[in-house]
UniProtKB/Swiss-Prot annotation:
It holds the Pfam family Apocytochr_F_N. Keywords: Chloroplast, Electron transport, Heme, Iron, Membrane, Metal-binding, Photosynthesis, Plastid, Signal, Thylakoid, Transmembrane, Transmembrane helix, Transport. Binds 1 heme group covalently. GO terms for biological process: photosynthesis. HAMAP family: Cytb6_f_cytF (MF_00610). The keyword Acetylation does not apply. One of its GO terms (cellular component) is chloroplast thylakoid membrane. Coiled coil: none annotated. This is Cytochrome f. It comes from the Eukaryota. Belongs to the cytochrome f family. Heme binds at residues 33, 53, 56-57. Component of the cytochrome b6-f complex, which mediates electron transfer between photosystem II (PSII) and photosystem I (PSI), cyclic electron flow around PSI, and state transitions.
Length: 318
C-alpha cells in the first residue's frame, strides 16, 4: 500500500513538473489559453458590444449559435456554437511548423443562466459534449462560459449544457425574452494579451531603406533582416520569427511598415447572438386552457346548430 502511494505521488509530481516546464519553455503556447484573457478583462463583452477576444484574433470570421426559442425554468437545454472553417487548411504553430487549427468559444448568457451541473445533464447531451471541459469566466460570472483551445476538426460545433434559472427561487430572473451573445475563434491569435505579436501575423519593416542582408537562423528558425536607413545610413535589424514566409529579398528598397512577410493567418474571430424566452409554466397552462375552451365552444356551437336544424325540420313536418 505504501509503495502504491509513493508511486502515485511520484507520477503526479512528474506530470506537474512536465506541465510547468512546458509553460516556461513555450510561453507562446500557454498564452493561447483563455486564462490569460481572463486575467486582462473583468468582463469579456465591452460596452460597445465588442467581445475582447477580437483584440488578439484580428481577422473576422463567421460564428453562429443555436438555442431553443423558449425554455421552462430550472431546465437543462443545449446551446450549439458553430465555428465553420476549411478543414483542409493548416495554421502556423508556435514553433513555426504547420498543424491543425484549434477553436474556442465564449457564450455570454443572461444573468441567472449557467453551466448545467454534471448530474443534471441528460445522456444524449453528454454524448454530444464528448470530452470537452468547460469553465466559468470568473467565480462571480457563472453566466459566462469559456472553452478552448480544442481541436477544430473534432469540435467545430460545440454543445454547451445550460441550466435555466427559476424565478421562484432566483429573484434576479424574470419570465422575459433574453439576448445571448457568443464569440468564437478558429486558429491562433495575432497578438498576445501583453501586446506582443505572435508568429501568426504579418511582420513589417521598421524603417525606410535598403535590405543589405537577410540571415536565416538555421537552428531556431526565422530571419534577421538588416535594413540600411535612407535617412542617415544607420542599420536596423528586424527579427522575423519562424512561421511567416519572406516576400522580400536582399538589395530591395523598402518603405517603413512595408510587409516583410506574407500573412500566415488562416483563422479568425466572429461574434453572434440569439434570443431565448424564459417561459412561465402558468402562462402555458393558461394558453392550453384557452385553446381547450375555444374547441369546446366550437363543439357546443355545432351541437346547438344541429339541434336548431332538427327543431326547424320538425316544425316543417308538422
Amino acid at each position: 500500500m505504501q509503495n502504491k502511494n509513493n508511486y502515485n505521488w511520484l507520477k503526479e509530481w512528474v506530470i506537474r513538473s512536465f506541465l510547468l516546464l512546458t509553460l516556461l519553455t513555450w510561453p507562446s503556447v500557454s498564452n493561447a489559453y483563455p486564462i490569460f484573457a481572463q486575467q486582462g478583462y473583468e468582463n469579456p463583452r465591452e460596452a460597445t458590444g465588442r467581445i475582447v477576444c477580437a483584440n488578439c484574433h484580428l481577422a473576422k470570421k463567421p460564428v453562429d449559435i443555436e438555442v431553443p426559442q423558449s425554455v421552462l425554468p430550472d431546465t437543462v437545454f443545449e446551446a450549439i456554437v458553430k465555428i465553420p472553417y476549411d478543414m483542409q487548411v493548416k495554421q502556423v504553430l508556435a514553433n513555426g511548423k504547420k498543424g491543425g487549427l484549434n477553436v474556442g468559444a465564449v457564450p455570454i448568457l443572461p444573468q441567472g443562466f449557467e453551466l448545467a451541473p454534471s448530474d443534471r445533464i441528460p445522456t444524449e447531451i453528454k454524448e454530444k459534449i464528448g470530452n470537452l471541459s468547460f469553465q466559468n469566466y470568473s467565480p462571480d460570472k457563472k453566466n459566462i462560459i469559456i472553452v478552448g483551445p480544442v481541436p477544430g476538426k473534432k469540435y467545430s460545433e460545440i454543445v454547451f449544457p445550460i441550466l435555466s434559472p427559476d424565478p421562484a427561487s432566483n429573484k434576479e430572473s424574470n419570465f422575459l425574452k433574453y439576448p445571448i451573445y457568443v464569440g468564437g475563434n478558429r486558429g491562433r491569435g495575432q497578438i498576445y494579451p501583453d501586446g506582443s505579436r505572435s508568429n501568426n501575423t504579418v511582420y513589417n519593416a521598421s524603417a525606410t531603406g535598403k535590405v543589405i542582408k537577410i540571415f536565416r537562423k538555421e537552428k531556431k528558425g526565422g530571419y534577421e533582416i538588416t535594413i540600411e536607413k535612407t535617412s542617415d545610413g544607420r542599420q536596423v535589424v528586424d527579427i522575423v520569427p519562424p512561421g511567416p514566409e519572406l516576400i522580400i529579398s536582399e538589395g530591395e528598397f523598402l518603405k517603413v511598415d512595408q510587409p516583410l512577410t506574407n500573412n500566415p493567418n488562416v483563422g479568425g474571430f466572429g461574434q453572434g447572438d440569439a434570443e431565448i424566452v424564459l417561459q412561465d409554466p402558468l402562462r402555458i397552462q393558461g394558453l392550453l386552457l384557452f385553446f381547450a375552451s375555444v374547441v369546446l365552444a366550437q363543439i357546443f356551437l355545432v351541437l346547438k346548430k344541429k339541434q336548431f336544424e332538427k327543431v326547424q325540420l320538425a316544425e316543417m313536418n308538422f
